[in-house]
């Protein structure tokens, strides 16, 4: 008999949004990984299958229990196929362009898929994972840079100290504690009567409403400022965002939501899954404060 686990709050938010917009692909995390020309594709396929078999989170199936609550478990009997293709460069480009498609979170198909492609000039791995089973740490780090490389080189895969399923049970239990109730009361009072800022994005695309990105920021002056004032670069950028938002809203005090990685438990460092948390932020852009003091204030806000 399979054991059902609750969804993390981080997963639940993704689940609800996807149920509201089932045709959206904004929560698809897809990548095209160009492989070295001398790579052995048969060996790469074996390595890929080894990783897939080893990581239960990739086998996650979501279902509704008798009370209509979403629950998850690892369906190790459901095959996650690895596609193998030899095609022209033009065919490969068309294949990649059409690769991303909506997932049915309650359906029969796996929530990830993988394809190895070989053309006359390129070798590549194309893969897509739904955000409900993966985050940036998993998608960009643990899977391609650690597990896949180790498996290809014949090295053992690092074991997961704790699975997301176990952490989800712990999170559900914490919601019943006095500490959780006190934290909920703290945030309710802190943001009571405060309207959260809302920025209009660009025209809707396949990824939803997006904001145009620019590459004008240079890393060197940011690092120099942070070293001089003993602040973290992510907090400097968070403070800059808060200040810009304050100016756009024409309010000294501005509230908005941001994200944190959610892997505060060290036993989750090697764990596959979606741990990114949405957190509320309240910034006071006091014009009398220095930049360094404002960044320090933001750091305290995030603790």
What do these predicted regions represent?
Residues 52, 145-153, 242-246, 280:
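Short amphipathic alpha-helical signal-transduction/dimerization elements
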Residues 3-6, 24-43, 92, 106-127, ...:
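Gly/Ser/Thr-rich phosphate-binding loops and adjoining beta-strand/alpha-helix segments
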Residues 191, 275-303:
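Helical lid/core segments from catalytic subdomains that handle acyl or acyl-like groups
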Residues 1-22, 45-90, 108-110, 151, ...:
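Short amphipathic alpha-helices and their capping loops
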Residues 4-6, 10, 117-163:
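Active-site-proximal acidic secondary-structure segment that organizes catalysis
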Residues 46-54, 98-102, 132, 225, ...:
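Amphipathic alpha-helical regulatory segments at dimerization interfaces
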Residues 55, 59, 134-149, 252-259, ...:
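Extended, hydrophobic beta-loop-alpha segments that form or line the acyl/peptidyl-thioester binding
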């Amino acid at each position: 008999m399979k054991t059902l686990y609750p969804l993390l709050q981080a997963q639940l938010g993704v689940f609800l949004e996807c149920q509201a917009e089932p045709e959206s692909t904004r929560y698809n995390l897809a990548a095209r990984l160009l492989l070295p020309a001398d790579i052995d594709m048969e060996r790469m396929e074996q390595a890929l299958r080894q990783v897939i078999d080893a990581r239960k989170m990739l086998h996650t199936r979501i279902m509704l229990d008798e009370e209509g609550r979403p629950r998850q478990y690892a369906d190790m009997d459901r095959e996650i196929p690895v596609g193998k293709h030899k095609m022209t460069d033009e065919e490969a480009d068309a294949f990649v362009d059409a690769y991303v498609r909506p997932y049915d979170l309650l359906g029969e198909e796996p929530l990830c898929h993988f394809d190895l492609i070989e053309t006359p000039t390129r070798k590549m791995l194309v893969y897509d994972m739904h955000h409900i089973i993966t985050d940036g740490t998993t998608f960009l780090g643990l899977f391609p840079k650690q597990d896949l490389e180790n498996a290809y080189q014949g090295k053992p895969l690092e074991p997961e100290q704790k699975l997301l399923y176990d952490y989800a049970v712990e999170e559900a239990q914490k919601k019943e504690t006095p500490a959780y109730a006190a934290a909920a009361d703290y945030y309710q009072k802190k943001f009571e009567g405060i309207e959260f800022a809302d920025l209009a994005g660009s025209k809707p695309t396949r990824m939803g409403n997006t904001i145009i990105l620019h590459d004008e920021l240079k890393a060197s002056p940011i690092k120099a400022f942070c070293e001089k004032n003993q602040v973290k670069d992510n907090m400097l950028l968070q403070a800059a965002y808060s200040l810009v938002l304050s100016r756009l809203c024409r309010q000294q005090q501005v509230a908005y939501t941001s994200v944190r990685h959610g892997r505060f438990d060290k036993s989750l460092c090697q764990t596959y899954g979606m741990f990114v948390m949405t957190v509320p932020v309240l910034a006071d852009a006091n014009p009398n404060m220095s930049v360094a003091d404002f960044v320090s204030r933001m750091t305290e806000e995030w603790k």
